[in-house]
Design a protein with these regions (language model features):
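N-terminal pre-triad scaffold of radical SAM enzymes
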Residues: 25-30, 287-314, 347
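Conserved, mostly hydrophobic/aromatic
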Residues: 165, 271, 306, 331, ...
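Flexible glycine/acidic-rich beta-alpha junction loops that bind and position SAM and/or redox cofactors
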Residues: 84-93, 141-143, 173-178, 203-207, ...
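N-terminal [4Fe-4S]-dependent radical SAM core
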Residues: 1-19, 29, 224-299
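Glycine-rich beta-alpha loop elements in corrinoid/cobalamin-binding modules
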Residues: 29, 37, 56-249, 256
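Acidic, low-complexity intrinsically disordered tails
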Residues: 372-375, 591-642
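Terminal amphipathic helices with adjacent charged low-complexity linkers/tails
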Residues: 61, 189-237, 251, 260-263, ...
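Conserved SAM/AdoMet-binding glycine-rich loop
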Residues: 24, 55, 59-60, 337-485, ...
Length: 642
């Protein structure tokens, strides 16, 4: 019989429990799978002997919905879920999404805006004397004063506004156990300065070696102060050399302790070897379950962390740059568990993490001294000390595909092709194409302008073209017809109209036709978001061009889909503005024909439209493929949560 964590009073009674130690409020539907953070935290606490219950997506208008499992003995836990609740609800154009893959039946509207704040207020109303701990991606990335794109304002730390006692940042397993032990031993408050990976409020600056960044009051009115604060926070996010950070809010301080140490391989194995049912809670059966599970139910998380340091990605600020991997045996055991499930069809959908082929530390130094301050490991140029060996990842994939009951093992999470090139490993590409590509391999060049890719922290155009050549050569040798599917992004800070035109010309020359494109979304806590808000690169203090006006962003977006008749006026306006009339005409180099703006809009109305964008939330392009690119639900938001 599958056993879920407690969700109802009847579950408590069946176990003979009069009360719970922790009640966890989640903005996501309850899915008991290791890709869903509430399940991981709940199971981890359970494994240490604590009694845990989950209230998933409670009615935030009714305080009684938060009381249904009774008063917790130790603490209330609150998370918005696997995504920031505002990103979950709104597109880059600030339009409401029609679906929510983390809710039953994919229905939108089951969580409030700024869910961490709303849930926290309700739990304080329900149990005022019970300690409140917040965590998850929303809390983690809003732990300092931050820019909020959806309100276009600088907001206070979510710790201040939620009135929580503690904020856990990062992945949370080690922190929650330390906090649980401190609560259980009645030494909660005195323990706070000594627990890594948490934030708390203090009336005074702690009497330890710490660094103070500009206050909330300063960053709210001064963009240079905002950039300085971000730089300090960015530089101290290493568990080996990072110092505690304080930021004044009014007459109190937000204190961030040093980051939690990376999990050992044994700890990683333990976290993923817990007795997850790998299913959504049966209470969702009548609505067809929870769509987000379909993407990950038969996938394996082999590691955490990413040393790619993409500027727009939250991983550095949440999981860190130091890779934490699982043992082959742990992954094989999980694969065997999946094989035994009735609905397993023989396909392991993915083996990876934030980046599929980052299976080990970037270099040996990281294990002792941490990731280098002020330097990146992989891009725009790989560090001379970067360990690019792919042997461990290849060995893992070989073991998995030999398991009885496995027909195919796919690699679908982000593959860093520049890392493959640094390894000069054509054999890896050929083996990947032979056994682990399902017709299309997704990669993320994001842009081709050197100026833009440098701002993004990505490899350049040349690396993408080299990998594309390797990929095509491998498939020719194998006699396979497989396609490279690149992600591209518009309107990233630093991207001018000229850069957008350069990308359009590249797409023309490479015969790529983007069916869906992604506008940059300034999510809290990222380097790119700091650049977007301030117009400053906080790492060097230099000004950065930012396309903020809707018309300017629309022109960059339209250039990526210049063949769409609906985009004609925007593309022509952009080309004239950039003095690129040479691209208007009938020649092979031209992007559009020279008809007047506003005419010809009825042309091709009878033709079936395919691959239209949906509010800027996704990005796919075809490379010479005549077929429609397939996209599963939930995939469009994965890269913001990895």
């Amino acid at each position: 019989m599958d056993t879920f964590l407690v969700t109802e009073r009847a579950d408590m009674e069946a176990r003979g429990w009069a009360e719970l130690d922790f009640v966890l409020i989640s903005g996501d539907a309850y899915v008991d799978h290791p890709s869903f953070a509430p399940a991981v935290i709940g199971r981890y606490l359970e494994s240490k002997g604590y009694r845990v219950g989950i209230i998933a997506q409670p009615d935030w208008n009714d305080v009684n919905a938060f009381k249904k499992l009774g008063k917790p003995r130790l603490a209330s836990l609150v998370t918005a879920g696997n995504l920031d609740s505002m990103l979950n609800k709104f597109t880059a154009a600030k339009k409401i999404r029609r679906e929510d893959d983390y809710s039953p039946g994919g229905e939108a509207g089951h969580r409030p805006d700024r869910a961490t704040l709303v849930y926290s207020n309700r739990m304080k109303e329900a149990f005022r004397d019970v300690p409140l701990i917040i965590g998850g991606i929303e809390a983690s990335l809003r732990r300092f004063g931050h820019y909020d794109y959806w309100s276009d304002t600088v907001r206070r730390s979510i710790l201040v506004d939620s009135k929580a006692d503690v904020l856990i940042y990062g992945m949370g397993e080690l922190q929650i156990i330390e906090l649980a032990e401190a609560l259980d031993q009645n030494r909660f408050e005195e323990s706070l300065p000594n627990i890594r990976g948490i934030c708390y409020m203090s009336k005074d600056i702690p009497s330890i070696d710490c660094v103070e960044c500009p206050s909330f009051e300063e960053i709210k009115v001064d963009k240079m102060a905002f950039a300085d604060a971000f730089r300090i926070q960015y530089d101290e996010q290493d568990p080996f050399y990072g110092r505690p950070i304080v930021q004044k809010h009014g007459d109190r301080y937000v204190v961030q302790n040093v980051p939690a140490l990376p999990l050992t391989q044994e700890q990683m194995d333990a976290a993923y070897d817990l007795p997850y049912t790998r299913k959504w809670h049966p209470s969702y059966d009548d609505k067809g379950g929870v769509p987000a599970l379909s993407e990950v139910q038969f996938s394996l998380v082999s590691q955490r962390g990413c040393f790619g340091s993409c500027s727009f990605c939250a991983i550095t600020n949440h999981q860190g740059r130091i890779i934490q991997n699982r043992s082959h045996q742990s992954l094989i055991d999980e694969a065997k568990l999946m094989i035994s499930m009735d609905d397993f069809k023989g396909y392991i959908h993915d083996v990876g993490g934030p980046t599929a082929n980052f299976r080990h530390l970037a270099c040996d130094k990281q294990a002792v001294f941490g990731a280098c301050k002020g330097r990146t490991c992989a891009a725009p140029e790989p560090c001379e000390n970067l360990n690019t060996n792919h042997d461990d990842y290849i060995a893992l994939l070989r073991k998995l595909r030999k398991l009885k009951g496995v027909k195919k093992v796919f690699v679908r999470s982000g593959l860093r092709y520049d890392y493959v090139l640094a390894d000069n490993n054509k054999a890896f590409v050929k083996e990947l194409c032979q056994y682990h590509v399902s017709g299309q391999l997704k990669v993320a060049p994001e842009h081709v302008s050197k100026r833009v890719t440098t701002m993004m922290g990505k490899a350049g155009k040349e690396e993408f073209l080299t990998f594309k050549k390797w990929f095509e050569e491998a498939n020719r040798e194998l006699g396979k017809k497989q396609f490279l599917v690149p992600y591209f992004m518009s309107s990233h800070p630093g991207c001018t109209l000229e850069d957008a035109i350069e990308l359009a010309e590249f797409l023309r020359d490479q015969h790529m036709y983007p069916e869906q494109v992604q506008d940059f979304i300034p999510t809290p806590g990222s380097l790119s978001t700091c650049m977007y808000y301030t117009g400053i690169n906080p790492l060097d203090g230099k000004p950065v061009y930012v396309a903020k006006k809707g018309r300017d962003k629309a022109k960059q977006r339209a250039l990526m889909q210049y063949k769409n008749i609906e985009n004609y006026d925007l593309v022509k306006e952009a080309l004239i503005e950039a003095n690129r009339r040479d691209l208007i005409g009938f020649g092979p180099e031209c992007l559009i024909p020279p008809r007047p703006i506003g005419q010809g809009k009825v042309q091709n109305q009878g033709r079936k439209k395919t691959g239209q964008s949906r509010g800027g939330q996704s990005r796919y392009a075809r490379s010479g493929s005549p077929s429609q690119v397939n996209k599963t639900k939930g995939e469009r938001k994965r890269r913001f949560t990895r």
